Curated annotation (Swiss-Prot):
One protein family per Pfam: UBA_4
Site (Interaction with 5' end of substrate DNA): 187, 306, 324, 360
GO cellular component: cytoplasm; PML body
The protein's required cofactors: Mg(2+); Mn(2+)
Entry's transmembrane regions: none
Active site: 271
Cellular location(s): Nucleus; Nucleus, PML body
Annotated protein name in UniProt: Tyrosyl-DNA phosphodiesterase 2
Taxonomic lineage: Eukaryota, Metazoa, Chordata, Craniata, Vertebrata
Biological process per Gene Ontology, one example term: double-strand break repair
Amino acid sequence: MEVEEAGAVQTGTGEAVVANERTKQCSAFASITGCDEAVAQCFLAENDWDMERAINSYFEPGVESTLQNKPAADLADPLKQEMHAVTSDACIDLTSDDLVATKSEAVTSNSSTVKQQEDESHFTFLTWNIDGLDESNVAERARAVCSCLALYTPDVVFLQEVIPPYCEYLKKRAVSYKIITGNEDEYFTAMMLKKSRVKLISQEIVPYPSTLMMRNLLVANVNISGNSICLMTSHLESTKDHSKERLKQLDTVLKKMMDAPPSATVIFGGDTNLRDQEVAKIGGLPNTILDVWEFLGKPEHCRYTWDTKLNNNLRACYTSRLRFDRILYRASMEGSQVIPQFLNLVGTEKLDCGRFPSDHWGLLCDFDIIL
């Protein structure tokens, strides 16, 4: 694509910078949506070069007529087809009792679900790397994630590796949740807070200055059943080679947890990419911060959240079983206590496409509120 044809002014240093930036935007848009750069240019120009608005516009149901007029070769792009199918679905209240009752035979009755939802003495929490960067079978996998939300109706959800189209899909499907994100471009973390249970007080994004992978710490101060809770999620630097940066990021997380007001319970959850030896290398966690899996007696059934022995999404030719996804907890030093009670894996059922919702298992945790 010629920059001149994109309508950019051809002269002047400042204008050249704008043209270069718009070229980059076209490339990023094309990468996220799977369209070619000419189509990207059209959507961006129509939306005043606002990336989020352009992506939302592209994935609106009204884009169907545009796609129908495109060559068959363009329609064959898997990501475009699947994400278009996803975002064409009607809005669904994922905490609806009827939906929960029909999503799985594991739910034996509506009454028990409703009772659980109305019980102010506990809340449920889910953290999950949903692998939005994997374009394969993304529609079926996204629906499976929403089925898990409908089944378990967690009050708080932390997600990692969310991409803009996936986020828009969740906003359309999960209308019972308020969704806040750690970024808007490329891929990022997100929190989903059930509107009927969780009151958002404030939010903050804490940067990791030396990250090479656009990682940060998303923080939300909330109130659940009268209890002040500081929620934190992050996707720490990936791969064994980036251990040093990962531990710097962990240090930021731990300091932020310890600096939270003493009246607040602090819950961190996310894809930490941590190896046990890395935690040992820094002398373990501070005395006031607990690893929930360890606190609950190291249950074997949910030890590994990254498990290529059982999860074939990566199609790895090796076996790797690691506890990448972790929940850390700092108790309130005043008033009522929020105590972790139970931990389980989600997303472990293979889908019709032969794959799982993500290459990670999700971690579902029940917390009791003790007055």
